Design a protein with these regions (language model features):
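Conserved catalytic scaffold of divalent metal-dependent phosphoesterases
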Residues: 1-35
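Catalytic metal-binding/acid-base residues of hydrolase active sites
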Residues: 7-9, 40-44, 61-62
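Acidic, His/Gly-rich catalytic cores of divalent-metal-dependent hydrolytic chemistry
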Residues: 35, 48-120
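N-terminal start-of-chain detector that recognizes signal peptides
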Residues: 8-9, 26-29, 45-49, 54-56
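Hydrophobic, aromatic-enriched interface-forming segments
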Residues: 33-42, 47
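Short hydrophobic beta-strand that contains or immediately precedes a catalytic carboxylate
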Residues: 3, 38, 57
Length: 120
Protein backbone atom coordinates (compact mmCIF):
# COMPACT_ATOMS: atom_id res chain seq x y z
CA UNK A 1 0.00 0.00 0.00
CA UNK A 2 1.24 3.49 -0.86
CA UNK A 3 0.16 6.65 0.96
CA UNK A 4 0.83 10.08 -0.57
CA UNK A 5 -0.58 13.54 -0.02
CA UNK A 6 -1.39 14.15 -3.69
CA UNK A 7 0.85 12.05 -5.93
CA UNK A 8 4.40 10.72 -5.99
CA UNK A 9 5.39 13.67 -8.17
CA UNK A 10 3.73 16.55 -6.32
CA UNK A 11 2.20 17.55 -3.00
CA UNK A 12 -0.17 19.91 -4.85
CA UNK A 13 -1.25 18.26 -8.10
CA UNK A 14 -3.60 15.28 -7.89
CA UNK A 15 -6.22 13.77 -10.18
CA UNK A 16 -9.89 14.43 -9.52
CA UNK A 17 -12.31 11.49 -9.09
CA UNK A 18 -13.53 12.05 -12.66
CA UNK A 19 -10.09 11.26 -14.06
CA UNK A 20 -9.94 8.36 -16.47
CA UNK A 21 -8.70 4.95 -15.39
CA UNK A 22 -5.69 5.52 -17.65
CA UNK A 23 -4.80 8.80 -15.93
CA UNK A 24 -5.14 7.32 -12.44
CA UNK A 25 -3.10 4.31 -13.53
CA UNK A 26 -0.35 6.54 -14.94
CA UNK A 27 -0.12 8.57 -11.72
CA UNK A 28 -0.37 5.81 -9.11
CA UNK A 29 0.93 2.57 -10.69
CA UNK A 30 4.48 3.95 -10.50
CA UNK A 31 4.20 3.68 -6.70
CA UNK A 32 4.50 -0.08 -7.14
CA UNK A 33 1.68 -1.04 -4.78
CA UNK A 34 -1.74 -2.62 -5.31
CA UNK A 35 -3.48 0.12 -3.30
CA UNK A 36 -2.69 3.84 -3.62
CA UNK A 37 -4.28 6.25 -1.15
CA UNK A 38 -4.08 10.02 -1.42
CA UNK A 39 -5.73 13.13 0.03
CA UNK A 40 -5.37 16.79 -1.03
CA UNK A 41 -8.59 17.07 -3.10
CA UNK A 42 -11.06 16.61 -0.18
CA UNK A 43 -13.30 14.31 -2.28
CA UNK A 44 -13.67 10.80 -0.86
CA UNK A 45 -13.85 7.84 -3.23
CA UNK A 46 -12.55 4.32 -3.82
CA UNK A 47 -12.03 3.06 -7.36
CA UNK A 48 -10.67 -0.25 -8.59
CA UNK A 49 -8.69 0.58 -11.71
CA UNK A 50 -7.67 -2.99 -12.54
CA UNK A 51 -6.94 -6.33 -10.90
CA UNK A 52 -3.58 -4.84 -9.90
CA UNK A 53 -4.55 -1.35 -8.68
CA UNK A 54 -7.13 0.30 -6.42
CA UNK A 55 -7.00 4.08 -5.94
CA UNK A 56 -8.69 5.85 -3.02
CA UNK A 57 -9.00 9.38 -1.70
CA UNK A 58 -9.46 9.91 2.03
CA UNK A 59 -11.89 12.80 1.71
CA UNK A 60 -12.01 15.38 4.50
CA UNK A 61 -13.17 15.28 8.08
CA UNK A 62 -13.82 19.01 8.31
CA UNK A 63 -13.85 20.61 4.87
CA UNK A 64 -15.32 18.30 2.22
CA UNK A 65 -15.38 19.39 -1.42
CA UNK A 66 -17.82 16.75 -2.69
CA UNK A 67 -21.07 18.39 -1.55
CA UNK A 68 -21.62 15.92 1.32
CA UNK A 69 -21.31 17.90 4.56
CA UNK A 70 -20.68 14.83 6.70
CA UNK A 71 -17.15 14.18 7.88
CA UNK A 72 -15.46 11.59 5.65
CA UNK A 73 -12.67 9.22 6.49
CA UNK A 74 -11.10 6.18 4.91
CA UNK A 75 -11.11 2.85 6.74
CA UNK A 76 -8.71 0.05 5.85
CA UNK A 77 -9.74 -3.55 6.40
CA UNK A 78 -6.46 -5.25 5.62
CA UNK A 79 -5.67 -3.71 2.25
CA UNK A 80 -9.31 -3.01 1.34
CA UNK A 81 -10.21 0.70 1.63
CA UNK A 82 -13.75 1.96 2.21
CA UNK A 83 -15.21 5.39 2.91
CA UNK A 84 -17.16 6.15 6.09
CA UNK A 85 -19.26 9.25 6.75
CA UNK A 86 -20.23 10.76 10.10
CA UNK A 87 -22.84 13.45 10.76
CA UNK A 88 -21.75 16.39 12.89
CA UNK A 89 -23.16 19.79 13.81
CA UNK A 90 -22.05 21.96 10.88
CA UNK A 91 -24.03 24.94 12.22
CA UNK A 92 -22.10 24.82 15.51
CA UNK A 93 -18.85 24.66 13.55
CA UNK A 94 -19.90 27.67 11.44
CA UNK A 95 -20.79 29.60 14.59
CA UNK A 96 -17.40 28.81 16.16
CA UNK A 97 -15.65 29.79 12.95
CA UNK A 98 -17.39 33.17 12.76
CA UNK A 99 -15.89 34.40 16.02
CA UNK A 100 -12.47 32.78 16.01
CA UNK A 101 -10.45 35.52 14.27
CA UNK A 102 -9.06 33.12 11.68
CA UNK A 103 -7.93 34.89 8.50
CA UNK A 104 -10.33 34.23 5.62
CA UNK A 105 -12.96 32.77 8.00
CA UNK A 106 -15.82 33.93 5.74
CA UNK A 107 -14.31 32.10 2.77
CA UNK A 108 -13.78 28.93 4.80
CA UNK A 109 -17.35 29.20 6.14
CA UNK A 110 -18.77 29.32 2.59
CA UNK A 111 -16.93 26.12 1.73
CA UNK A 112 -17.95 24.43 4.98
CA UNK A 113 -21.62 25.38 4.49
CA UNK A 114 -21.78 24.08 0.92
CA UNK A 115 -19.26 21.26 0.90
CA UNK A 116 -17.81 22.76 -2.29
CA UNK A 117 -14.62 24.70 -3.00
CA UNK A 118 -15.19 28.44 -3.40
CA UNK A 119 -13.14 31.27 -4.78
CA UNK A 120 -11.90 33.64 -2.03
Amino acid sequence: MALVHASSESSWRAPEPEASDAELDAVYRRLGQSVAIYAHIHRAYVRRISEELTVANTGSVGLPYDGDLRAAYLLLDGSTPSIRRVEYDVDAELKALSGCGLPHADWIARMLATGKPQMP
